A protein has these predicted regions:
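A structural signal for leucine-rich repeat
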Residues: 100-103, 122-126, 145-151, 168-174, ...
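LRR N-terminal entry segment and analogous cap-like coil->beta motifs
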Residues: 82-132, 245
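A generic tandem-repeat structural signature
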Residues: 117-215
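Consensus "Asn ladder" position of solenoid repeat domains
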Residues: 93, 114, 135-138, 159-162, ...
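Leucine-rich repeat domain C-terminal region
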Residues: 201, 207-214, 222-224, 294-382
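Leucine-rich repeat
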Residues: 96, 117, 141, 164-165, ...
Length: 382
């Protein structure tokens, strides 16, 4: 029993010696450089103000600091999508629904070329900053009435090549451009575009819609500059389109004639597209309502003569009349008799693929054309 104390007593000098060596080592000058951290947290420390640093040091001294590790501020991105510069690209992924976790600051969302069939109420929740949305080439046939409500600042909506049968409801008032062509829309109800006073452009061609499919007041309140209803089932110029129109494209329909009152509302038109229809006649005076018209498309119709009224259109510059049944061109069909009555010369007149021979047309017929190369003439029929 006497060996225990003796052992502890004998070890004390050794412990004291080791302790003295450790203290001496710590007191000795060191030539090593201090550790310098490089990484995310260095930037975080650099951005912290002196007050925040002092608070942290005081907490450590008082023992009240809690360890909290924050992850880097990396934005979310739906699985399989590409997110860059507030553009989220989720096209060509075979998606059957709108993906989750779309960053709330997204400006443009690309969902085209997928297999989405429905837009649900909360699909775009939180995306109030969205500027453009592409849903082109999906299988969407159903849209919840409140699906677009969160999109307070959206200006462009691309909805072509889907299975829509009606215009979606409650579209954002901020909308400027909408493309809903190549769907299955047969009817546009009254007030379908209500509240869209900022809308500038609507492309809704290639829908199986007839004239009767546009209810009275369908376009009420719109101040459009551009409207295209091509490749549809129209047999006449639709009624009550926006008076503000600058461009109206009704090509590739089944329109058979242009009546006197058809164009009365559209005094602001610059460009009118009526090509690829079945038009045999434009009633005398029907073009007189278009004083600002610059470009007129009547190609691929069944006209037998140059429409009346062209010489009185002071700003008309381009007329497409090719591929018709025009067999004769009069000397005053294009140009006014009085000098200086026309404000701008023609820079394009197409008459090829008509049964009229160019040598039978008097040179004075084109006296108000800027250059003879602007006249496209030929004697072949497609």
């Amino acid at each position: 029993m006497s060996r225990g104390p003796v052992f502890e007593f004998n070890m004390l000098p050794h412990c004291s010696l080791l302790l003295l060596l450790c203290v001496a080592r710590l007191l000795a000058p060191s030539s090593a450089l201090p550790f310098e951290q490089r990484g995310f947290w260095d930037f975080a420390m650099d951005s912290m103000d002196s007050g925040g640093m002092m608070t942290m040091m005081r907490d450590e001294e008082e023992g009240s600091a809690t360890e909290e590790i924050l992850p880097p501020d990396i934005p979310m991105c739906p699985f399989g999508c590409h997110c860059r510069l507030r553009v989220v690209q989720c096209s060509d992924l075979g998606l059957i629904e709108v993906p989750k976790n779309i960053p709330p600051d997204t400006k443009f969302l690309d969902l085209q070329n997928n297999r989405i069939t429905e837009l649900k109420e909360n699909d775009f929740k939180g995306l109030s900053n969205l500027y453009g949305l592409s849903l082109r080439n999906n299988l969407i046939s159903k849209v919840h009435p409140r699906a677009f409500v969160p999109l307070k600042h959206m200006q462009k909506l691309y909805f072509s090549r889907n299975l829509l049968t009606t215009v979606p409801q409650n579209l954002p008032a901020s909308l400027v451009e909408m493309r809903i062509h190549e769907n299955r829309i047969r009817k546009v109800e009254a007030g379908a575009f209500a509240g869209l006073s900022n809308m500038n452009c609507i492309e809704m061609g290639a829908n199986p819609i007839h004239n009767s499919g546009f209810e009275p007041g369908a376009f009420k309140g719109l101040k459009l500059n551009y409207l295209r209803i091509s490749e549809s089932k129209l047999t006449g110029v639709p009624k009550d389109l926006p008076e503000s129109l600058h461009e109206l494209h009704l090509d590739h329909n089944q329109i058979q004639a242009v009546e006197l009152e058809d164009l009365r509302r559209y005094k602001n038109l610059f460009r009118l597209g009526l090509g690829f229809n079945h038009i045999r006649n434009l009633e005398n005076g029907s073009l007189s309502y278009l004083p600002r018209l610059r470009e007129l498309h009547l190609e691929n119709n069944r006209l037998t003569r140059v429409p009346k009224g062209l010489p009185d259109m002071k700003y008309l510059q381009v007329v497409y009349l090719h591929s018709n049944n025009i067999a004769q061109v009069g000397v005053d069909d294009f140009c006014p008799r009085g000098f200086g009555m026309k404000r701008t010369f023609y820079n394009g007149i197409s008459l090829f693929a008509n049964p009229v021979n160019y040598w039978e047309v008097q040179p004075a017929t084109f006296r108000c054309v800027s250059d003879r190369l602007a006249i496209q003439f030929g004697n072949y029929k497609k």
